[in-house]
Structure formats: C-alpha cells, structure tokens
C-alpha cells in the first residue's frame, strides 16, 4: 500500500513476472484504476520497437511502464538486456494525476524486484532511446 492508499493488483505483478521470467512481453504499461485504489495493467506488448513503446506514452496523462531494454555492448560482447521502470509524468498532465502517480510509485516499484534502472520522464527527450541507453549502460558498469 502506498502513501496515497493505492495498492498493486495481482495482475500487475503477474505481467511483470511474465516479462522478466517468461520473456512473454517486451513492455507493460500500468495505470491507476478509475476509482484510484489500485495499480492495474493498461496494456502489454511483444513489439520490439522502442518507437512503438514511446508512441504509447500519453501526451497529457501519467503512467508507469516496465520495458525489457536490449542494447549492444561494445567490443563484440553481444547484447545485454535490462529491465527499466518508467514513471511518465508529462508537464501537461493534470496536477492531481501527477500527485497521485508520484505518491503511488513506491508501492509498485517495491513490488517489482529485478529492475535495473528507474527513469523519470516529463517529456520525450528524457525517455529517448539514447537517454535510456546512457542510463542503463552506466548502471551496468559498461561504457
């Protein structure tokens, strides 16, 4: 339970585990239920396109997302995969929505074990592939 009184739905944890353990999804989008009591799955996707993921982020509303971020490592070491947690809170979102999402984030974040990086986005430049790649590769200790 978060400071806002919002809890995490079982389906939200199941979708995360399906992404993390089963590689069933590439990303999961989470939102807060209409009655503002539960963090629920809004959408899951198997699309490999990061641009498609970015296209799902609403211009005027908040959400949370988990993304299985793959990237190449230099020196022919191959690909790495890191699970990234996004808090999307655009400047144009309603203040009340931003407050509820900010105060509910910890409940979801604590429930999702195995996340490598946290990204807070208020505009698309903060969640661009290059920006996330830089953050993820730093947390992995490879440059």
From Swiss-Prot:
The UniProt entry, under Gene3D superfamilies, shows: Severin (3.40.20.10)
Q: InterPro entries attached here?
A: ADF-H, ADF-H/Gelsolin-like_dom_sf, ADF/Cofilin
**Gene Ontology terms: cellular component:** actin cytoskeleton; cytoplasm; nuclear matrix
What are the alphabetically sorted keywords of the record? Actin-binding, Cell cycle, Cell division, Cytoplasm, Cytoskeleton, Nucleus
The Gene Ontology terms for molecular function here are:
actin binding
| GO BP of this protein | actin filament depolymerization; cell division
Give residue ranges for domain ADF-H: 5-137
| Chief localisation class | cytoplasm
Localisation: Cytoplasm; Cytoplasm, Cytoskeleton; Nucleus matrix
| Family listed | Belongs to the actin-binding proteins ADF family.
Function field: Controls reversibly actin polymerization and depolymerization in a pH-sensitive manner. It has the ability to bind G- and F-actin in a 1:1 ratio of cofilin to actin. Binding to F-actin is regulated by tropomyosin. It is the major component of intranuclear and cytoplasmic actin rods. Required for accumulation of actin at the cell division site via depolymerizing actin at the cell ends. In association with myosin II has a role in the assembly of the contractile ring via severing actin filaments. Involved in the maintenance of the contractile ring once formed.
Provide the protein name.
Answer: Cofilin
């Amino acid at each position: 339970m978060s400071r806002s009184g919002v809890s995490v739905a079982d389906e939200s944890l199941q979708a995360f585990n399906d992404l993390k353990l089963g590689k069933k999804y590439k990303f999961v989008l989470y939102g807060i239920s209409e009655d503002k009591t539960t963090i629920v799955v809004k959408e899951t996707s198997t699309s490999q396109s990061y641009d498609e993921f970015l296209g799902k982020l609403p211009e005027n509303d908040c959400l949370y997302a988990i993304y299985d971020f793959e990237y190449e490592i230099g020196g022919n070491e191959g690909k790495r995969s890191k699970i990234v947690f996004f808090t999307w809170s655009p400047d144009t979102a309603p203040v009340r929505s931003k407050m509820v999402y900010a105060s509910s984030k910890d409940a979801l974040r604590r429930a999702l074990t195995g996340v490598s990086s946290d990204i807070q986005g208020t505009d698309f430049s903060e969640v661009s592939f290059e920006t996330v790649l830089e953050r993820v590769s730093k947390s992995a200790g490879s440059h």
